[in-house]
Amino acid sequence: MIDGEEIAEELLSELEKVDASPKLRIILVGENQASKTFVDEKIEAAERIGFRAEVEKFHENIEEQEVIEEVKAGNKASDVHGILVQLPLPEQISEERVFEALKTLKDVDGLTPKNMGKTLRGEPEILPGAVEAVEKILEQELGSLESLEVTVINNSNLIGRPLSMVLSERGATVTLCNRKTEDLEKHTEKADAVVTATGQRGVLRPEMVREGTIVIDAGYSLGKGDIEDKEKMDRKTSFCGVPGGAGPLTVAVTMKNLLNCYRNQ
């Protein structure tokens, strides 16, 4: 099994040596348990390496404008160096409008229009934590990503779309799948690597991939991931699962992004 936690520990150890204490403000809307757990992990990581983190919590039915005003307040706060809006947001809130309000220099997830534009042009400055985590795992396993066939089961702005651009820039051929993709197995069984990040248990099964495929489960549903039969998947593939896989590395990359935001201000 591929150990993403080991790579995360190496990165956090390097960050711990830095003589700086940047502050992260996290905006959490609603009672999604997976989101709350992920926020707790980010706070714990920040405190461990001498960074600072705080959470602004809001109820599920909050108006979009209130969230935008909270983002703008963080933009103006001189003691806040990075802002993270925990996704997903409730359906009444537009992610696009929220990230349009976020100051690019404080965007630790790389989701403002300016940062997304740079990623799409192949000039990323800040990548979403999960995207860089997956890239690092593939890099560790393969070195070069040229000519790699990758199937990504996720087409969100947080993971699937930026990941496809980053891997394409590295010379990989990427197939991006979404909830309406028919015959998913047709796309997964041809791949050298499969990344799944849907938050839906059982979306990817061992019989859907070839022997020796690299499989990265970046899904997060209360620490369980997208794959049910993990033991069989681990025997058949080079498997990076949940817990202990992409999740801890995603958190570590977020801390690295926070430091970069701090240095750029």
Give the location of each predicted region.
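Conserved hydrophobic helix-helix packing surfaces used for dimerization/oligomerization
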Residues: 22-24, 150
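Short, high-confidence coil segments that cap the C-terminus of an alpha-helix
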Residues: 78-80, 191
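Short beta-strand elements in bilobed, periplasmic/extracellular small-molecule ligand-binding domains
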Residues: 46-60, 174-176
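Short, well-structured alpha-helical segments in soluble
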Residues: 66-78
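Anion-binding alpha/beta catalytic cores of soluble intermediary-metabolism enzymes, centered on
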Residues: 84-145, 202
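Positively charged, low-complexity intrinsically disordered leader regions
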Residues: 1-20
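Glycine-rich phosphate/diphosphate-binding loop of Rossmann-like nucleotide-binding domains
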Residues: 29, 34-43, 125-210, 214, ...
